[in-house]
Amino acid sequence: MKKEHVLHCQFSAWYPLFRGVTIKSVILPLPQNVKDYLLDDGTLVVSGRDDPPTHSQPDSDDEAEEIQWSDDENTATLTAPEFPEFATQVQEAINSLGGSVFPKLNWSAPRDAYWIAMNSSLKCKTLSDIFLLFKSSDFITRDFTQPFIHCTDDSPDPCIEYELVLRKWCELIPGAEFRCFVKENKLIGISQRDYTQYYDHISKQKEEICRCIQDFFKKHIQYKFLDEDFVFDIYRDSRGKVWLIDFNPFGEVTDSLLFTWEELISENNLNGDFSEVDAQEQDSPAFRCTNSEVTVQPSPYLSYRLPKDFVDLSTGEDAHKLIDFLKLKRNQQEDD
């Protein structure tokens, strides 16, 4: 895998080519000061709120106690930076997409941070929703700091123009998502995306699902992407229509799910024990899914559910983060 392969999988690199078969999206350049703010791990103070300042007296003991904390002469006042012009652009884009969006950077979405949102979802309606997810996500940090990890070429890292991608929010059923592996423009493997769960309909419809994905690949994807080796994700809706979700590099940086990268690169044993579709045709890809509830596994995102900020709290190293976090949660509840 080379750096150019990673660049070709940036959302803005492929979206214009496949706009007609994917979810409507808006791409906004990410200002440098916003990037700096997202990478600043000093506090959990989140920017992007439009609440006017208030000077009313506290109407509860909790608020009085809150003010007492801030009266401590040794306590620094923590305020979030504001980005009014960018905030306006983001809100206009969100409104144009129906009021709710799925956010991501050039490559990654903050899937590892869904648990921190009030609705335990990546559904965002405001810039502050997006910032909370992004600042809590290791995936987003890696996009910023290690975009070319596992690349084999030694050339200097290309300059990256970071972008905020806002995708129209759609309620996608995890059991209808599949990851497809392409080598030399040939579809060699299809894996259930949410492999930690057993879905009865996949086992019953596997041949039809495989056939639909093959037809979609041949009609819309094959020979049209910028590389010969790549990975793409699709969603098959209740009517059987297939939608393109994303592209990823063909290599270790991408999760191989129910395959191994050794199998995919060598193409050995692809139609082994896991295969559920007869490879009667030479071009038929291997299809793998979770076959029973016995093989169900914990979510791969569970390991991300204890940020260092909370570890700091348990050791008493940073109580200010807890205060900021609780304030944010209360404000979100008031908005709802």
Swiss-Prot record:
One GO cellular component assignment for this chain's record is: cytoplasm
* Source organism superkingdom: Eukaryota
**Subcellular location, principal:** cytoplasm
Residues that bear Phosphoserine: 60
The uppermost taxa in this organism's lineage are: Eukaryota, Metazoa, Chordata, Craniata, Vertebrata
The entry's family comment says: Belongs to the CDC123 family.
Job of this protein: ATP-dependent protein-folding chaperone for the eIF2 complex. Binds to the gamma subunit of the eIF2 complex which allows the subunit to assemble with the alpha and beta subunits.
Q: In its UniProt entry, what is this protein called?
A: Translation initiation factor eIF2 assembly protein
- Binding residue positions for ATP: 104, 107, 109, 111, 167-170, 177, 179, 193, 233, 246, 248
Recorded name of the encoding gene: CDC123
Q: Where in the cell is it found?
A: Cytoplasm
